[in-house]
Swiss-Prot record:
Belongs to the IspD/TarI cytidylyltransferase family. TarI subfamily. The gene is tarI. Catalyzes the transfer of the cytidylyl group of CTP to D-ribitol 5-phosphate. CTP binds at residues 7-10, 82-88, 113. This is Ribitol-5-phosphate cytidylyltransferase.
Length: 235
């Protein structure tokens, strides 16, 4: 089975424009989270869309689904997320297992709730690549020169941009593989390895690159929200 896992566990209100976490802010005529879920509803191969939300916001998320996506709510599961990204993925997988016991071939397409401009093509590419690889990471080519500084004051290296990519989401992999690999990490490794695909890489698994889009914006600042609103208005 193919599942979607939407990471919506953040509680930050650092934009300073609302008491709502950013995934619940309005973008056009509906919340950012709803825009994101709608993109996954369009892919018929996805059995369930599981949304990991902070415990304080589960009821709010359920109300939004009832209001904006009543025809699709049977395909959507709202569950309590974890304390961080990877524990939220683990909670999402636990919710999948509760719905239907996991098999070794079950795949989860994980995605940031605040990336509402994901395309159906990106979702389908992730699913297709995951059939033949251990994991998939969605990326775009780096367009700016990246500099490295080990002390925050002076440049220590300027890597070759031709070999660099900017990571986005979705990130896609088999549910059981993630659970096994995450479970094999020490507590110290769990603190450091906050990116799911990095866990696969350091464990020697093959992680394929899926082509992202520069429009696959992650809305984390007021400027991002302004850009997103202008993108919605153009559509």
């Amino acid at each position: 089975m193919i599942y979607a896992g939407i990471l919506a566990g953040g509680t930050g209100t650092r934009m300073g424009i609302s008491n709502l976490p950013k995934q619940f802010l309005e973008l056009g005529d509906r919340p950012i989270l709803i825009h994101t879920i709608e993109k996954f509803v369009l892919e018929p191969s996805i059995e369930k869309i599981v949304v990991g939300v902070h415990g304080d916001w589960v009821s709010h998320a359920e109300d939004l689904v009832d209001k904006y996506l009543p025809l699709y709510k049977e395909r959507i599961i709202i569950t309590k997320g974890g304390a961080d990204r990877n524990t939220s993925i683990k909670k999402i997988i636990e919710a999948i297992d509760a719905y239907r016991p996991l098999t070794p071939e079950d795949i989860v397409v994980t995605h940031d709730s605040v990336r509402p401009f994901i395309t159906l093509r990106m979702i389908q590419d992730n699913i297709q690549l995951a059939q033949n690889h251990d994991a998939v990471d969605t990326v775009v080519e780096a367009v700016d020169t990246i500099v490295e500084s080990t002390n925050g004051q002076f440049i220590t290296d300027i890597p070759n941009r031709a070999h660099l990519y900017q990571g986005q989401t979705p990130q896609t992999f088999r549910c059981k593989d993630f659970v096994d690999l995450y479970g094999s990490l020490s507590d110290e490794e769990k603190e450091i390895l906050t990116d799911a695909c990095k866990i696969f890489v350091i464990k020697g698994k093959d992680v394929a690159l899926a082509k992202g889009e520069y429009s696959n914006l992650k809305i984390t600042t007021v400027t991002d929200l302004k850009i997103a609103k202008s993108m919605i208005e153009k559509d």
